[in-house]
Amino acid sequence: MQYKTFLLPASGSEQTEENLNVFLRTHRIVSVRTEFVAGETLAWCVFVEFV
């Protein structure tokens, strides 16, 4: 298995969202886990497991 993480700002980032969508469309995804991160900046952390 391989892993990749994405950090999506809660305020939105079209480029980051597009990067995530392209990655998901072009890889064999095993699982996706999301967690909301409330630190200095608010964001969604997306953890992708793929083959």
Feature-to-residue mapping (PLM):
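C-terminal edge-of-domain segments
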Residues: 40-51
